[in-house]
Curated annotation (Swiss-Prot):
Homohexamer. Its main location: cytoplasm. Pfam families: AA_kinase (PF00696). Keywords: Allosteric enzyme, ATP-binding, Cytoplasm, Kinase, Nucleotide-binding, Pyrimidine biosynthesis, Transferase. This is Uridylate kinase. InterPro entries: AceGlu_kinase-like_sf, Asp/Glu/Uridylate_kinase, Uridylate_kinase, Uridylate_kinase_bac. It comes from Ruegeria sp. (strain TM1040). It is found in: Cytoplasm.
Amino acid sequence: MPQSPEQPDVSSTVSYNRVMLKISGEALMGTQGFGLHPPTVRRIAEEVKSVHDLGVEICMVIGGGNIFRGLSGSAQGMERTTADYMGMLATVMNALGMQSALEDLGVFTRVISAIRMDEVAEPYIRRRAVRHLEKKRVCIFAAGTGNPYFTTDTAATLRANEMNCEAIFMGKNGVDGVYDKDPKTNEDAKRYDSVSYDDVLAKRLKVMDASAIALARDNNLPLIVFGLDEPGGFRGVLAGEGTYTKVHG
């Protein structure tokens, strides 16, 4: 298939074989204030397909904040454990929506849930998930770690390590990397080209929660933060092109 101007042929320069793509649930909302926006879900699925077409094995974790966020529920008086489980179920809904969009594009996809719900998703079995990746199926890991008090950032880092991913790619909406302060409210915010995990923790930069950062650091797992709303952004960043921040040891 010929490449569009926004998606140059980078197949010869991509050095990754297996990666984790982490996106927030809010990324699926589009211009809506809640839920899934099907055209937006399809656009992101097309980004994933463009990388899958290069032969890269792809894991995904999608947050659930577009439907329900456990911390928000807890802050409003809901029991924390129950709120977190509700948030995990929201991630399953998002995973099923993304699976539908990917398979509509011809990409075989498996939703793998940390909480058993056999009618709609496979249970998490590491060796089976690895085999899916080897068969070039996209694996979407849902329901977080299956435990309350752990974020989907931590789940993404955990699964990336278990699946032997070479890096985590964090697709952000409206932000193209890691900044020293919020670029949406500070015009003088400066973007880092690269930053260490220790600096992220020490400076409390908003990348991932501290548990996820520490887990990535301790296993020497690089993290690339880029803008998901840029057409061809995921594919380009895999080739070292475009704007992004690399977080490393």
